[in-house]
């Protein structure tokens, strides 16, 4: 998206772009201009269930690939992101509001690195094996992917936070059902378009937009998801952890980080660093400084 021209968006389920089953949409507005920039599908539980079923069907083929085969697919996604760098950065500014030059391009560049890092790390998964207790026996380690991973992501870093969860899960052979924050669904669709353009197999990544109370809750509770990964607020994280009880759960919630200034600090540099720590991304970051402790 290179202008404020509004468009009707779609969800990605089983390799196909489609509206919500109900046909419902909601307007999303640019915080930079106040203009409507898209009509976002309002998925519900049935859409999430359809996506989970697609991810389960895709799991066997994806997980049976070697790490090197999956890495090649992951690098292909990185290639598409690099080609679409300008478009992705502009979309981020329109949808989320980050300044184009100082923050949006940086986030897109980080996005590429997340994909490439996960691709390479998956080739090198290591670990120690104990010696066999018998000369006639050999100890082997067989790694198996967990299954379908539900991914729920926030609005403040709408490219890098999804990549932080999506890329490692995919590189290790899992398939994914992803629902983004409703306020930055345009960015989510743009990232999903990159994955589709890179020819990830149908059903390996599924994007379902809509209210978290329905879509996110279904992803967390549905027995078809074997793990749930969440980044977001503490109250929502607690609800996700409760809904996903009994599954593997990875949760990153809001922090309460102080900025500590020691008595031997360079005050000018400390002030500059404190402003950056507290107000990067308008202060909407889990690592943002919330208190100032001066020695």
Language-model-derived ranges and their functions:
Residues 166-167, 216, 237, 271:
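Generic hydrophobic/aromatic pocket-lining and core-packing "Φ" positions
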Residues 138-139, 206-226:
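A structured beta-alpha segment of the ubiquitous adenosine-cofactor-binding alpha/beta core
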Residues 128-202:
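Conserved small-residue-rich beta-alpha loop and adjacent elements
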Residues 35-125, 136:
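Glycine-rich loop-to-alpha-helix module at the N-terminal edge of alpha/beta enzyme cores
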Residues 1-40, 72, 76, 127-152, ...:
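Terminal low-complexity tails and localization/encapsulation signals of metabolic enzymes
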Residues 34, 70, 92, 173, ...:
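Residue-level signal for inorganic ion chemistry
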Residues 167, 226-231:
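Periplasmic-binding protein-like
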Residues 227, 235-295:
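ALDH superfamily catalytic-core signature
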């Amino acid at each position: 998206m290179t202008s404020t021209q509004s468009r009707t968006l779609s969800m990605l389920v089983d390799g196909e772009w489609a509206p919500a089953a109900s046909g419902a949409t909601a307007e999303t507005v640019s915080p930079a201009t106040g203009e409507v920039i898209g009509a976002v599908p309002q998925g519900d539980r049935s859409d999430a269930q359809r996506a989970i079923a697609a991810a389960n069907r895709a799991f066997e083929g994806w997980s049976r690939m070697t790490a090197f085969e999956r890495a090649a697919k992951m690098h292909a996604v990185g290639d598409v992101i690099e080609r679409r760098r300008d478009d992705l950065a502009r979309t981020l500014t329109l949808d989320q509001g980050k300044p184009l030059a100082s923050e949006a391009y940086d986030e897109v560049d980080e996005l590429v690195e997340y994909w490439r890092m996960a691709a390479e790390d998956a080739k090198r998964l290591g670990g120690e094996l104990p010696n066999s207790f018998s000369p006639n026996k050999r100890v082997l380690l067989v790694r198996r992917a967990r299954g379908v991973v539900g991914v729920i992501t926030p609005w403040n870093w709408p490219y890098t936070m999804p990549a932080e969860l999506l890329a490692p899960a995919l590189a290790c052979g899992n398939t994914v059902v992803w629902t983004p924050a409703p306020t930055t669904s345009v960015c989510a669709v743009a990232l999903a378009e990159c994955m589709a353009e890179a020819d990830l197999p149908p059903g390996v990544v599924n994007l379902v937009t809509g209210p978290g109370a329905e879509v996110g809750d279904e992803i967390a509770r549905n027995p078809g998801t074997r793990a749930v990964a969440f980044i977001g607020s503490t109250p929502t994280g607690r609800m996700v952890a409760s809904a996903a009880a009994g599954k593997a759960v990875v949760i990153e919630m809001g922090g309460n980080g102080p900025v500590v200034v020691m008595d031997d600090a360079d005050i000018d540099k400390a002030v500059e660093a404190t402003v950056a720590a507290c107000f990067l991304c308008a202060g909407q970051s889990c690592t943002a400084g919330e208190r100032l402790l001066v020695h």
